């Protein structure tokens, strides 16, 4: 009898601290979030007619000032580029107002790759669900321009865009995953047909927790 009681006390002594430790801290969320395939498909369907579209489904509060954004991204073929934008005074004024980022140089290397992106505060995880292509990663940004856009639902916070120097290319196909820390270059060098991929973005103090994409928001 004593042994049974002692075992019970020992078990309680072990389990109670674990239960207390596992409780969410005050002010942190206490419920889980489900994002259905139907919701993701609904958002993706609105993107297919566009060359590039990146939309989060939700911005989920995960506690301690952190959020997790789940989105779906569509990119059309890079082999049929759109016409170059018309030059004019408006474009010149906009360029003058941007803040340089990365290394500035008058004569970038001939093998520099356009379309490099980095994010100041967000890690991104990509999971390819359709299509594929050749991505480029790592290296450093040359002649970049800093974006300060920070809408409630993203898809991203501030970052830098420009030329990539010293990057290397990787093939990404359905089922492949790419994880990009803040400040690390990523982009697409070649997309034969299209690529669609889920994005997972943890960030701290960047997005508005609770935001829901209007396409799937309850009316």
Place the predicted regions along the sequence by residue.
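Bacterial N-terminal signal peptides
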Residues: 8-19
